[in-house]
Every structure is written in structure tokens, then in C-alpha cells.
């Protein structure tokens, strides 16, 4: 399995942002701006979706699936656990305050970000 580099991961993240924005925007048109429906959809897209999708058979978000990436356990390449997903998710939110966290993937041997190292996960190109 080949490790996924910074650019592929950045493309997957960009796709996920576009997908989330489109879904939230559609919810705004459907439910009306600021409605409970929009808030629920936003919570689902910004919290639930990126937290739980790595636990599915896709092993990642739709953006990662489209680019052909999977989030797996570092040592075994198997599906990650819920605690690992939580660690990845919480640490990944640091990028909201510092986009530099993703640059570690460009400089580490296993192309890992800080949240990958903390959760003991890696991102691979899907076969």
C-alpha cells in the first residue's frame, strides 16, 4: 500500500469542504437561513460526518473516497477504532486555528499529520 501525500490529502479535504458547503447551502434553501434544520444539517456535516465516516467500509469521507484514499490503523492497515476516530477528529480541529498541522504530512516518513501520529493512523491510496 502506498502512503498518501500532502497534495492528495489536501485535495480530499477541499472536496469535503465543497461537499459540506453544498449540503449546508441546500439546507438553507430548503429550511430557511438560521432555522433549526440548517443548524442540524451543519452539525451533521461538520461534526458527525467527518467523525464517523472513517469507521465505515469507505474508511474515510466522500472526499477521500473520490480521491482514492483510506484512513487505516498505522501498524495493521485495518479499519480504525472509534477512539482513534475521536483523537483524529479532535486534533484535526486544531487546523481551524492553525493550517500548519497538515504540513507535517509533507515532512514525516509515513506522511502523517499530527492527528495521524496521535491516533496511530496513516492514510493510504486505496487499491
Swiss-Prot record:
Pfam families: RDD (PF06271). It comes from the Bacteria. GO terms for cellular component: plasma membrane. The chain crosses the membrane at residues 12-32, 36-56, 85-105. Its main location: membrane. Keywords: Cell membrane, Membrane, Transmembrane, Transmembrane helix. The keyword Cell membrane applies. InterPro entries: Pra-immunoreactive (IPR051791), RDD (IPR010432). Signal peptide: none annotated. It is a multi-pass membrane protein. It is found in: Cell membrane. PANTHER family: MEMBRANE PROTEIN, PROLINE-RICH ANTIGEN HOMOLOG-RELATED. This is Uncharacterized protein YczC.
Amino acid at each position: 500500500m502506498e502512503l498518501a501525500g500532502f497534495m492528495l490529502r489536501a485535495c480530499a479535504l477541499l472536496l469535503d469542504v465543497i461537499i459540506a458547503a453544498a449540503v449546508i447551502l441546500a439546507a438553507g434553501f430548503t429550511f430557511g437561513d438560521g432555522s433549526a434544520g440548517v443548524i442540524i444539517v451543519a452539525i451533521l456535516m461538520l461534526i458527525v460526518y467527518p467523525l464517523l465516516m472513517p469507521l465505515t467500509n469507505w474508511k474515510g469521507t466522500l472526499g477521500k473516497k473520490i480521491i482514492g484514499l483510506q484512513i487505516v490503523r498505522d501498524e495493521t492497515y485495518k479499519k480504525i477504532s472509534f477512539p482513534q476516530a475521536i483523537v483524529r477528529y479532535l486534533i484535526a480541529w486544531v487546523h481551524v486555528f492553525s493550517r500548519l498541522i497538515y504540513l507535517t504530512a509533507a515532512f514525516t516518513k509515513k506522511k502523517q499529520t499530527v492527528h495521524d501520529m496521535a491516533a496511530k493512523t496513516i492514510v493510504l491510496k486505496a487499491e
